[in-house]
Design a protein with these regions (language model features):
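A membrane-topology feature that recognizes alpha-helical transmembrane segments
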Residues: 1-148
Length: 148
């Protein structure tokens, strides 16, 4: 049963990230309805890991740190980092847990950095160019699923 819940949580996270990435690419903003719709399943997954799998409370709190950090950056950076990126990372932390969330954020930032360096080298972008983060977060989560 535990593995079935894990697969359902992974599928929910993939669906969530796919829709959020599409909104981020095409609309350059995330509908507030999307994170709100996945908040309840995320809380269920978090409580399931705490109650049934014996996950440590500190690990569940650590799953929220990347999202909290991005929300803090969104508030401090005058829109350079979007609030939707932080909210979606918080929901990913609730759905997937600390390890997958931290891996996805790290891999997503690495992939985004590589693309930015490539575009800067080709002079297709400058330091003020805006890039959507959520497609790279989704790619980072898919990489986690492939390597897990």
């Amino acid at each position: 049963m535990n593995s079935m819940i894990r697969y359902a949580a992974g599928a929910a996270a993939c669906l969530f990230l796919a829709v959020a990435a599409g909104q981020d690419v095409y609309r350059r903003q995330i509908s507030l309805f999307l994170p709100a719709a996945f908040l309840l399943p995320g809380l269920f997954c978090c409580l399931w890991r705490l109650a049934m799998e014996g996950e440590d409370l500190y690990m569940e709190a650590a799953a929220l740190l990347p999202g909290c950090g991005l929300c803090l950056l969104a508030g401090l950076s005058d829109g350079k980092v979007g609030w939707g990126d932080g909210l979606c990372t918080l929901i990913l932390g609730l759905l997937a847990g600390a390890g997958p969330c931290i891996f996805a954020v790290s891999a997503g930032l690495l992939l985004l950095s590589l693309l930015c360096v490539f575009l800067l080298a080709l002079r297709k972008a400058d330091r003020n160019s805006r890039m959507p983060f959520l497609p790279f977060l989704a790619a980072g989560y898919i990489l986690y699923l492939l390597f897990d």
